[in-house]
């Protein structure tokens, strides 16, 4: 895709299929631009000369040259200023035959429309002030959402919850910069425009707001992309059986032979509206001599590094021995859960004290930030034969990471937003230091202007080709 900022090309009338490609009951072809009605009325002659906005018209779509009927369609008209793009738009609902869709597109192009680029409809909505850049990105997030919570988060951002929060911060930033610039202008006259303590109060307010948003990125990303959970441990401890239990599907082969799992096995599921990707890996053992198994073990370590959560699984009958402790000590405690499996073989007992006592002298225990909380929240006694395990473990996992409710919370889930807001936070903190050291309004304005630029780039009030390409290249054609 070429640069999104194209001058005269943005005045073209564009067209594309907005529904997924392939055979279906219906397809929707979207047309947007100054010549929309003029072009579409030549193949949809049933449209009146002055159609009503948001009204649906029914009729036969015909070849503009021969008059042959192509399809029976519905044409929905949107007046300029009242459409998604802000331009005059007509959406043609036709039967979902790829042949019919392509025939209609060919007719539109022959009459002067241009095939739309990726994300060009949303780009035009942004350029015409119908959406800011955060909202434009949320359109893509909503389209790609794979769980209820991800869809809720994207919809809230589309409605402007994050944008409104950023605009509040922007207002405070603008106030500080305006007073800093005024202080520079009046400095020669010895007039103090605003006291330093007032500036510091505003800066602290901005810092608090930015910190709050930046801190939500981990939860926001988990809501958007889901949890990636890796099952790890020695061979033949029941990892594959647990994978099948969590996925509610016989995805992995289960045998009593150690080393059955040679490759990384993935599977997705949802629980309480949150997406989970489970990854089963080869059992970890030093004495593996088979080349394929050794490669599988290497992939196991790679999967652990890329995960959000690691479920360390061990056989409760055998207990936590030297090999188990060696694996545990290689894991990051911040994302590790212990699953003591095969409790059905010991009568369903849950010897938490034994686990705690065994781990107390380990390097893993020494790395725990809060040992008491870890043993209370992150040690599960499970059996792959018990279907209740799935809900018990996942419910606690969701509860610990966050009360993942997005209705009343402003979250960020986009890496670009996180980068920009982190930059704005750092500039704000440096600005506080400038004021504290009494370096003057010139240095404050110079430093703090960068913080405001970061907010403007997030909202799309300041942009260039590189930013636009980064945002809109992910869109499909037709959106």
Swiss-Prot record:
Mg(2+) binds at residues 240, 261. Binds 1 potassium ion per subunit. Exhibits a very high intrinsic GTPase hydrolysis rate. Involved in the addition of a carboxymethylaminomethyl (cmnm) group at the wobble position (U34) of certain tRNAs, forming tRNA-cmnm(5)s(2)U34. One of its GO terms (molecular function) is GTP binding. Homodimer. Heterotetramer of two MnmE and two MnmG subunits. Belongs to the TRAFAC class TrmE-Era-EngA-EngB-Septin-like GTPase superfamily. TrmE GTPase family. One of its GO terms (biological process) is tRNA wobble uridine modification. This is tRNA modification GTPase MnmE. The keyword Hydrolase applies. Keywords: Cytoplasm, GTP-binding, Hydrolase, Magnesium, Metal-binding, Nucleotide-binding, Potassium, tRNA processing. K(+) binds at residues 236, 255, 257, 260. It is found in: Cytoplasm. PANTHER family: TRNA MODIFICATION GTPASE GTPBP3, TRNA MODIFICATION GTPASE GTPBP3, MITOCHONDRIAL. Residues 226-402 form the TrmE-type G domain. SUPFAM superfamilies: P-loop containing nucleoside triphosphate hydrolases. It comes from Bdellovibrio bacteriovorus (strain ATCC 15356 / DSM 50701 / NCIMB 9529 / HD100). (6S)-5-formyl-5,6,7,8-tetrahydrofolate binds at residues 30, 91, 130, 479. Gene3D superfamilies: P-loop containing nucleotide triphosphate hydrolases, Probable tRNA modification gtpase trme, domain 1, tRNA modification GTPase MnmE domain 2. GO terms for cellular component: cytosol. Its cofactor is K(+).
